[in-house]
Amino acid sequence: MDQDAFILKEDSEVEREAPGGRESLSDVIGFLDAVLSSEPTDIGGDRSWLHNTINTPQGPGSAHRAKSEGEGEVSTPSTQDNRSGEESRVSGRTSKPEAEAHAGNLDKQNIHRAFGGRTGTNSVSQDLGDGGDSGILENPPNERGYPRSGIEDENREMAAHPDKRGEDQAEGLPEEVRGGTSLPDEGEGGASNNGRSMEPGSSHSARVTGVLVIPSPELEEAVLRRNKRRPTNSGSKPLTPATVPGTRSPPLNRYNSTGSPPGKPPSTQDEHINSGDTPAVRVKDRKPPIGTRSVSDCPANGRPIHPGLESDSTKKGIGENTSSMKEMATLLTSLGVIQSAQEFESSRDASYVFARRALKSANYAEMTFNVCGLILSAEKSSARKVDENKQLLKQIQESVESFRDIYKRFSEYQKEQNSLLMSNLSTLHIITDRGGKTDNTDSLTRSPSVFAKSKENKTKATRFDPSMETLEDMKYKPDLIREDEFRDEIRNPVYQERDTEPRASNASRLLPSKEKPTMHSLRLVIESSPLSRAEKAAYVKSLSKCKTDQEVKAVMELVEEDIESLTN
């Protein structure tokens, strides 16, 4: 059957069956898609027309929406007006004369455009204008039943059979439209690029179109859900990003290794392989993309990825622990911490035990544990020593305070003893000096109880003083005491001197007349002496009671003895 004639015949039948006589070109192409998919063997062997440039008479504000049996939807809504999918279909209609004019010129390219565009494009089905549900299938079914294979196997197969790509695309496998360059964006946000503003969905081609897609929270969630690993139909254990060490979910809104702009979510291999409209191809041997950092240097078990280095260092540490213990024991012995190396090995102290265990550690974790124990035990021992020193200082302080108290009480007791001793000495002095002061030494009346050394009478050169008188024989006698022939006849010279006599000197006239001059001068001698006040008062009182010159002489002798005893 002639293909062009079949297309024109079906197109004319569709136009006649339309209720209003006007149908959009997408409905015609969708009908042709259903007819052609039932009989794929009628298409000729020449498939070079599949790689030609697509030219469609759609306007800049149109949007394509199609559905295939059992598969997801692919929609590119316009950013100029936020309309629903049904309104977008109506907005893409053309007039009846235009449909008739283009119906005669439809060729194999339009047929491929309708058929391959539904099965080969991989787009993020997200309504950016309405912000509705993205409609991305979490686990797209493997409805066509094609066997899943790895990327490397498919690449080798495609390199061996270059014509197989066209066959895969005709049969519904994902393949990018080939034969021409990508059209530039004509509208805002790439809405008028005839569905090419979305990311390419080919798993065989490495080309990435740098078209911007405005990100949104729903779009990011959709990309994250798509990047999750999906379980295969064979019932194998599903692989998650946590158990696969070579994959990492790329961060959003950042430049990745492919150089995509920040506004575009990064496209991963899962996005090309497990698209909403294409059968998911399980990739078993997945390599991380070039330019991206490996996810983790340590796997899930928590150990580093270089077990050889750790085992070597562990063996080396086991071999060296004996020598390390010997060196440590030698060092402690040389520093004077311990007496001998045997004491370090046999000591039961916590610090020494942890030190030996740290030196015998097989790995870093055990060594860290033992070093921590060593530090804590040393801190505990130092804290204990600090407490002991505090207790010792407290005891020393208490003893010092007790010593101060004892010294204070001793000093007070010593003062009391000194005062008592001085009083005893004064009493003894009175007994020895005053006792036995009589003319006859043989009298038994007032014999001294303590015999002291006898005093030697010393003659003192006394300076002449008119207010002073002496009863001893002096070379120069003062005028107050004058020897004359009448003196022996006077019984009481003190009381009889008040009479004015020519024998009186001129110095006696200068003294007050209320008191006798001799008594006044004697009282001055007593008061000017270094005796105590009580003694002075007693001597003055006894002197005033004297009746004769002998009594006055005896009193003055006692005064002179006391003065000499104090001065000597």
Swiss-Prot record:
<dbReference type="InterPro" id="IPR016075">
    <property type="entry name" value="RNA_pol_Pprot-P_XD_paramyxovir"/>
</dbReference>
<feature type="compositionally biased region" description="Basic and acidic residues">
    <location>
        <begin position="150"/>
        <end position="168"/>
    </location>
</feature>
<feature type="region of interest" description="Disordered">
    <location>
        <begin position="38"/>
        <end position="320"/>
    </location>
</feature>
<feature type="modified residue" description="Phosphoserine; by host">
    <location>
        <position position="447"/>
    </location>
</feature>
<feature type="region of interest" description="Disordered">
    <location>
        <begin position="1"/>
        <end position="23"/>
    </location>
</feature>
<feature type="compositionally biased region" description="Polar residues">
    <location>
        <begin position="50"/>
        <end position="59"/>
    </location>
</feature>
<keyword id="KW-0597">Phosphoprotein</keyword>
<feature type="region of interest" description="L protein binding">
    <location>
        <begin position="412"/>
        <end position="445"/>
    </location>
</feature>
<dbReference type="InterPro" id="IPR002693">
    <property type="entry name" value="Paramyxo_PProtein_C"/>
</dbReference>
<feature type="region of interest" description="Disordered">
    <location>
        <begin position="496"/>
        <end position="516"/>
    </location>
</feature>
<dbReference type="GO" id="GO:0039689">
    <property type="term" value="P:negative stranded viral RNA replication"/>
</dbReference>
<feature type="modified residue" description="Phosphoserine; by host">
    <location>
        <position position="68"/>
    </location>
</feature>
<feature type="coiled-coil region">
    <location>
        <begin position="364"/>
        <end position="429"/>
    </location>
</feature>
<dbReference type="GO" id="GO:0097718">
    <property type="term" value="F:disordered domain specific binding"/>
</dbReference>
<keyword id="KW-0693">Viral RNA replication</keyword>
<feature type="modified residue" description="Phosphoserine; by host">
    <location>
        <position position="192"/>
    </location>
</feature>
<feature type="region of interest" description="Interaction with the nucleocapsid (N-RNA)">
    <location>
        <begin position="479"/>
        <end position="568"/>
    </location>
</feature>
<feature type="region of interest" description="Formation of N-RNA complex involved in transcription and replication">
    <location>
        <begin position="547"/>
        <end position="566"/>
    </location>
</feature>
<feature type="modified residue" description="Phosphoserine; by host">
    <location>
        <position position="257"/>
    </location>
</feature>
<feature type="compositionally biased region" description="Basic and acidic residues">
    <location>
        <begin position="7"/>
        <end position="20"/>
    </location>
</feature>
<dbReference type="Pfam" id="PF01806">
    <property type="entry name" value="Paramyxo_P"/>
</dbReference>
<keyword id="KW-0143">Chaperone</keyword>
<comment type="subunit">
    <text>Homotetramer. Interacts (via multimerization domain) with polymerase L; this interaction forms the polymerase complex. Interacts (via N-terminus) with N0; this interaction allows P to chaperon N0 before encapsidation and form the N-P complex. Interacts (via C-terminus) with N-RNA template; this interaction positions the polymerase on the template.</text>
</comment>
<keyword id="KW-1035">Host cytoplasm</keyword>
<dbReference type="GO" id="GO:0030430">
    <property type="term" value="C:host cell cytoplasm"/>
</dbReference>
<feature type="compositionally biased region" description="Polar residues">
    <location>
        <begin position="191"/>
        <end position="206"/>
    </location>
</feature>
<keyword id="KW-0175">Coiled coil</keyword>
<feature type="compositionally biased region" description="Basic and acidic residues">
    <location>
        <begin position="83"/>
        <end position="101"/>
    </location>
</feature>
<feature type="region of interest" description="N0 binding">
    <location>
        <begin position="33"/>
        <end position="41"/>
    </location>
</feature>
<dbReference type="GO" id="GO:0003723">
    <property type="term" value="F:RNA binding"/>
</dbReference>
<feature type="modified residue" description="Phosphoserine; by host">
    <location>
        <position position="249"/>
    </location>
</feature>
<dbReference type="GO" id="GO:0032991">
    <property type="term" value="C:protein-containing complex"/>
</dbReference>
<dbReference type="InterPro" id="IPR043097">
    <property type="entry name" value="PProtein_oligomer_dom1"/>
</dbReference>
<feature type="modified residue" description="Phosphoserine; by host">
    <location>
        <position position="125"/>
    </location>
</feature>
<dbReference type="GO" id="GO:0003968">
    <property type="term" value="F:RNA-directed RNA polymerase activity"/>
</dbReference>
<comment type="similarity">
    <text>Belongs to the respirovirus P protein family.</text>
</comment>
<comment type="function">
    <text>Essential cofactor of the RNA polymerase L that plays a central role in the transcription and replication by forming the polymerase complex with RNA polymerase L and recruiting L to the genomic N-RNA template for RNA synthesis. Also plays a central role in the encapsidation of nascent RNA chains by forming the encapsidation complex with the nucleocapsid protein N (N-P complex). Acts as a chaperone for newly synthesized free N protein, so-called N0, allowing encapsidation of nascent RNA chains during replication.</text>
</comment>
<feature type="region of interest" description="Multimerization">
    <location>
        <begin position="344"/>
        <end position="411"/>
    </location>
</feature>
<feature type="modified residue" description="Phosphoserine; by host">
    <location>
        <position position="449"/>
    </location>
</feature>
<feature type="modified residue" description="Phosphoserine; by host">
    <location>
        <position position="260"/>
    </location>
</feature>
<protein>
    <recommendedName>
        <fullName>Phosphoprotein</fullName>
    </recommendedName>
</protein>
<dbReference type="GO" id="GO:0006351">
    <property type="term" value="P:DNA-templated transcription"/>
</dbReference>
